[in-house]
Amino acid sequence: MLSLDGIIVVWFFLLGTCIGSFLNVVVYRLPRGESLIRPASRCPSCNHPIRPWDNIPVLSWIILRGRCRDCGSNISGRYPISEAIMGFWFIGCSLLAFNAAPTTKISSWILTVFLALFGTALFASTQIVQAGSKVPRVLCWLLLFALAGTLFALFSIMST
């Protein structure tokens, strides 16, 4: 049986992998000026929409052995790796924040949110640059906002 702490760690990992999955969409579509919402994710080879049960972060890639269910073409290992990295990032953010401010839960949650947001924006920016595109301005503003929020949360924790 998992303890409450174990459940929280699993929850943060799952949340992080879902955010990581969405980041894969952001990295691909944002530099191209495409919508982040529509159309639904598709196989780049056969253009077939990805079924919801084939879009479960990390797990679906493992079950499908890194291939499209419809055409059998390879799906890059970058996708589940990005999802797992974000899952572990979210775990790290929560552990750091709750150990930094064990007595002030609201400050811990605020720090967790801003740390996770900063890491998410930084990871997406890094992936976009690695793909050879320019980082969109909205992502730069998100990075600055998340950094300011992280610093504010840290200073408020340190002053209590």
Give the location of each predicted region.
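A membrane-topology feature that recognizes alpha-helical transmembrane segments
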Residues: 1-160
